[in-house]
C-alpha cells in the first residue's frame, strides 16, 4: 500500500493510485478470509485492530496514504476508529502492540474445530495485554509508528506525534541490539 502510493507520488501515474485503492477494495473478498491476513472482512467494515499486528499496522499506514491522496471520508472514519481501539485498548504504555505470540482469532472463530482461525504476533481482545508473555514484535511497533506518522500528516493533530515519539523511544528503539 505505502509503496504503491509512493510510486504514484513519484511518477504522477494514476494507475498506481488506482492499484492502491484496489488493494484496499479486495480486503474481505477472499472466501474464508482470515484476520491473520487482514482479509476476513472488507476494510471499510473494520472498526477495530485485528489479526497479525505487522500486517495490520502496515495496512493502516497504507490506507492513510490512500486517504491523503483521495480524501475518502470512509477511510478516515475507519482509521480513526481503529486508532482509538489500538491506543485505548490494545497498546502498552511503551507504544508496543501485537501482544499475542500465538493464539486463536477473537473474531474469526466459527466454533467448529476445522475452522478456528489461528493468529500469531497479533492483536488480541480489548485489554488483553499480558506482562510475562507479551510479544510486541519490533516490526509491529515500527508499523504503529508509521501509522501514527501518516495520521499526523493528514490531520495535523499532535496526539499522533506524541505516539510517534513514544514508539520511537520505547518500543522501536528497544529492538536494536
Residue ranges and their predicted role:
Residues 1-177:
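Glycan-recognition and catalytic cores of secretory/periplasmic carbohydrate-active enzymes
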Amino acid at each position: 500500500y505505502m509503496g504503491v502510493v509512493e510510486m504514484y507520488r513519484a511518477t504522477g501515474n494514476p494507475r498506481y493510485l488506482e492499484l492502491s485503492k484496489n488493494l484496499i477494495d479486495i480486503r474481505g473478498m477472499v472466501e474464508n478470509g482470515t484476520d491473520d491476513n487482514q482479509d476476513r472482512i472488507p476494510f471499510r467494515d473494520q472498526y477495530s485492530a485485528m489479526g497479525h499486528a505487522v500486517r495490520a499496522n502496515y495496512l493502516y499506514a497504507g490506507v492513510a496514504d490512500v486517504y491523503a491522496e483521495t480524501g475518502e471520508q470512509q477511510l478516515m472514519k475507519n482509521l480513526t476508529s481503529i486508532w482509538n481501539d489500538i491506543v485505548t485498548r490494545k497498546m502498552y504504555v511503551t507504544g508496543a502492540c501485537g501482544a499475542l505470540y500465538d493464539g486463536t482469532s477473537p473474531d474469526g472463530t466459527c466454533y467448529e474445530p476445522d475452522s478456528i482461525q489461528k493468529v500469531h504476533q497479533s492483536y488480541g481482545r480489548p485489554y488483553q495485554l499480558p506482562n510475562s508473555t507479551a510479544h510486541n514484535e519490533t516490526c509491529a511497533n515500527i508499523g504503529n509508528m508509521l501509522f501514527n506518522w501518516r495520521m499526523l500528516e493528514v490531520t495535523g493533530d499532535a496526539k499522533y506525534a506524541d505516539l510517534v515519539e513514544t514508539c520511537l523511544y520505547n518500543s522501536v528503539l528497544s529492538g536494536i541490539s
